[in-house]
């Protein structure tokens, strides 16, 4: 009699676990959505920087950023993550009508979260940077292009 109750309890537990488990989405689809979000956030930053009314653009262009030698895989997003602090500091120079401090903080937070999801939490990848530096607009454009190329390989 107890065996039957035990089997019933186990079966009920399995049903509950199976029904409450999240349905797995396609890793490729999830990666595509995260890349789209990253591209959107980078474009918003780029639009704020490139705003023709931005009086501090010439000053912002004096700051130099490093790009990886060959960025071809998601693991190369570690290189973007390493440059984010400098990017954020430079963006704080430009608190214009189109790019407020709260917007910068929110976008940078979104980018950090998305990068963590895309590259994972392991920071074992060591970036190899180009010797030449780029401006803030080139930096953002190149990372947007990188995301587009990775996205196209996933479709």
UniProtKB/Swiss-Prot annotation:
Pfam families: IL2 (PF00715)
Keywords: Adaptive immunity, Cytokine, Disulfide bond, Glycoprotein, Growth factor, Immunity, Secreted, Signal
Subcellular localization(s) per the UniProt record: Secreted
Glycosylation sites: 23
InterPro entries, A to Z: 4_helix_cytokine-like_core, IL-2, IL-2_CS
Disulfide-linked positions: 79-127
Highest taxon listed in the record's lineage: Eukaryota
Signal sequence annotation: 1-20
Family matches, as SMART domains: IL2
One cellular-component annotation, GO: extracellular space
GO molecular function: cytokine activity; growth factor activity; interleukin-2 receptor binding
Gene Ontology biological process: activated T cell proliferation; adaptive immune response; cell surface receptor signaling pathway via STAT; extrinsic apoptotic signaling pathway in absence of ligand; interleukin-2-mediated signaling pathway; leukocyte activation involved in immune response; negative regulation of B cell apoptotic process; negative regulation of inflammatory response
Family, as annotated: Belongs to the IL-2 family.
Role according to the record: Cytokine produced by activated CD4-positive helper T-cells and to a lesser extend activated CD8-positive T-cells and natural killer (NK) cells that plays pivotal roles in the immune response and tolerance. Binds to a receptor complex composed of either the high-affinity trimeric IL-2R (IL2RA/CD25, IL2RB/CD122 and IL2RG/CD132) or the low-affinity dimeric IL-2R (IL2RB and IL2RG). Interaction with the receptor leads to oligomerization and conformation changes in the IL-2R subunits resulting in downstream signaling starting with phosphorylation of JAK1 and JAK3.
Protein's recorded name: Interleukin-2
Phylogenetic classification of the source organism: Eukaryota, Metazoa, Chordata, Craniata, Vertebrata
Recorded name of the encoding gene: IL2
């Amino acid at each position: 009699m107890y065996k039957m109750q035990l089997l019933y309890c186990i079966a009920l537990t399995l049903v509950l676990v199976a029904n409450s488990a999240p349905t797995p989405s396609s890793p490729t689809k999830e990666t595509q959505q995260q890349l789209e979000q990253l591209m959107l956030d980078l474009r918003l930053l780029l639009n704020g920087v490139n705003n023709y009314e931005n009086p501090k653009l010439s000053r912002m262009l004096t700051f130099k950023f490093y790009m990886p030698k060959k960025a071809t895989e998601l693991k190369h997003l570690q290189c973007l993550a390493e440059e984010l602090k400098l990017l954020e500091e430079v963006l704080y120079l430009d608190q214009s009508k189109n790019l407020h401090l709260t917007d910068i903080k929110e976008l940078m937070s979104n980018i950090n979260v998305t990068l963590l999801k895309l590259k994972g939490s392991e920071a074992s990848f060591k970036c190899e940077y180009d010797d030449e530096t780029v401006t803030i607009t080139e930096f953002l454009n190149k990372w947007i292009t990188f995301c587009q190329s990775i996205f196209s390989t996933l479709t």
